[in-house]
Amino acid sequence: MSAVRPIDHFLHLAGAEVALAAPGPTRSAGLRATELLAVTPKPVRRPSPQRLAVCEHLGTACAEMRPDLAAAFEALEPELAWRTRSIPNASPGFAEGHASARVLGPDGLEQRGGLVAGFSLVAPGITYPEHDHPPEEIYLVLSGGEWWQAGGVWHAPGPCGIVHHPPGIRHAMRGTSVPLLAIWFLLPSRSGSRE
């Protein structure tokens, strides 16, 4: 019997949490993500693993996580290629205070049914600026941090909280006294093809 791959173990745990999302559109998005996680993986050309200075906050983030998710993340993390990006009008320190690592989709570790997924890490005191995008998005919050969505107020869902962003809605997130770590899932359009 072969050992369970770290990516499969983490995504199994994350998928189970996302499937438990609240009723309504959030639950529908969570169930779609879970269905796509079950699609047979297709290999891709994996990026070389890479850590950035902001990754020093991962230990603190893992201490905030549920123990089984923390252990699964710690097993997967050495395979990840952490990257940063510049965003116009971002707050000072943003470039050094955040990173993301793609898990599924282009530049990820593999492909599954058109689902694009990755981790976001935001250092304490740093805000990931307001933005929007066409794909519907659902987050599984792994550590602390706060979230905002157009028409709402900043809130802290806490570890294992679910955050849902309908297509095109403005949203942002920020580290508080602790770093924010979450896995996000960008859902393909319903008319999109399954890979």
Write out the residue ranges for each language-model feature.
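Short beta-strand His + acidic residue motifs that chelate non-heme Fe in jelly-roll/DSBH
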Residues: 128-131, 148-149, 165, 170-176
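Ligand-binding loop in jelly-roll beta-barrel domains
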Residues: 168-190
